[in-house]
Regions:
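Interaction-mediating elements
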Residues: 1-110
Length: 110
């Protein structure tokens, strides 16, 4: 049930490959099955972060299994390596969602 939303002002040529790779990373970092990771990307977004230099905002949501202090570096490094975005132009938001507020297959997890 981890969900990652990637919004970037950069152009991403192979979105499917990037989504597959970031799904594997999130699965590994949360210790959740890759089959439950949902990933979304929006590239070429209008994002202003002091200027128009390429930047990226990532939203990561999950029922537990989030450790922002340990996850921030590998996720930032991934974005930098795959999209060429400088580390200082990457924001990441982590949200631990209560099981009672997350549904799948017609019912909530808690």
């Amino acid at each position: 049930m981890p969900y990652i939303n990637v919004s970037t002002s950069a152009k991403v040529n192979d979105k499917v490959k990037l989504l597959e790779e970031i799904s594997i990373l999130i699965s590994s970092l949360t210790n959740k099955s890759r089959s439950f990771v949902m990933a979304k990307i929006e590239d070429n977004c209008q994002i202003y972060f002091d200027d128009e230099t390429p930047s990226c905002f990532l939203e990561i949501k999950s029922i537990g299994s989030l450790n922002p202090s340990e996850m921030a570096k590998p996720i930032s490094d991934f974005v930098h390596q795959k999209m060429g975005i400088p580390l200082e132009r990457i924001y990441i938001s982590f949200e631990d969602v209560p099981a009672s507020l997350w549904a799948w297959n017609g019912r909530t997890f808690g």
